[in-house]
Amino acid sequence: MPKNTPIIRSLLDTDLYKFTMLQVVLHQFPAAHGEYEFRCRNHPDTPLTQLKQQLETQLDLLCELRFSQDELDYLRGLRFIKSDYVDYLELFHLQRRFISVSEEGEQLAIRIKGPMVQAMFFEIFVLAIVNELYFRPLDSKAVREEGRRRLEAKLAELERFQREEAPGQRFPLLIADFGTRRRFSRDWQAHVVERLNHALPQVFRGTSNVYLARKLGITPIGTMAHEFFQAFQALGVRLRDFQKAALESWVQEYRGDLGIALTDVVGMDAFLADFDLYFAKLFDGLRHDSGDPYIWGEKAIAHYRKLRIDPATKMLTFSDGLSVDSALQLQRHFSPHIQVSFGIGTHFTNDMGLEPLQIVLKLVSCNGQPVAKLSDSPGKTMCSDETFLAYLRQVFKVPALA
């Protein structure tokens, strides 16, 4: 493939939650300024610095893209997307000056600095580009065949579950593709989603990728990410109240739509302390993205029961490094008590027999102030300001990791 062929060919080729979060930013804090930093959590065989020149070219191409009228009409047809927001997107394109790429020793450094209405939208595109550039030299007929073999084995296991176990389950098995950011390639994700949609129509509930959802006529899935909550640490509310402010902001924007709340920005215990009866009734359920999923799920069920809410009326969505096997184990454990669904990423879109990259591009400051996530998993916290991290831990009574 020629080096100047764009990897990203549509601004819809990203996750739905980028659109849903951006709408809140545009309507409620349009002047906010954000800074994002890239990090690779593992040690790839080929240094990512070797991708710098190709990445620069791809970013130039990305920043030439605009939404087509057909794409805007599709977005306008989603009931939670407001018409003035689509009018804004008609004028929208990513500005190249807000993103920079450099080498810091053997590390690839990517930084995004700019208005949140711009900076927020880069992340998924950049991660997908880095992945595809990295794996392109490793792509081969043998790699694709291994990927197909693994995918078909997963489909067979899911079909077996549907046939043999699902009839006895209280709630159905629901699985979605969450794999855009870590995909092997654009065309491979399309193949995976098409196969899931064709083979498992009763199980596969959609994809986070808006382009593929539109193309295949399936449901785009997503609500919010950590960056949405983190921004509220710097938006003028008392730090102790940032989660409640973020949840309230979401409620006011979506009025009952998009009702799955993310819980691990400062840990599940601190989240539940803020997730009172008001929010527990308003939101449809919770999303798990770090820590032990069984402990987390039991805490969620106990919290609903303490509030005298029947857990069977709510949903737990699991999305932390899942495989088909781990999803099925969670389904067996929780479906007698509460509705469950699963967002599977790398295990669907980059299980080719090659070690996947563990790359992230995270919000590190907002309006010039540090922001952070105190994840339920060691190693997922990302903040260079140790003083702010210590203060955040103190405010939410989160013990420091040993």
From Swiss-Prot:
CDD domains recorded: PncB_like
Signal peptide interval: none
Keyword Repeat: no
Superkingdom of origin organism: Bacteria
Pathway where it operates: Cofactor biosynthesis; NAD(+) biosynthesis; nicotinate D-ribonucleotide from nicotinate: step 1/1
Described function: Catalyzes the synthesis of beta-nicotinate D-ribonucleotide from nicotinate and 5-phospho-D-ribose 1-phosphate at the expense of ATP.
Descriptive protein name: Nicotinate phosphoribosyltransferase
Gene name per UniProt: pncB
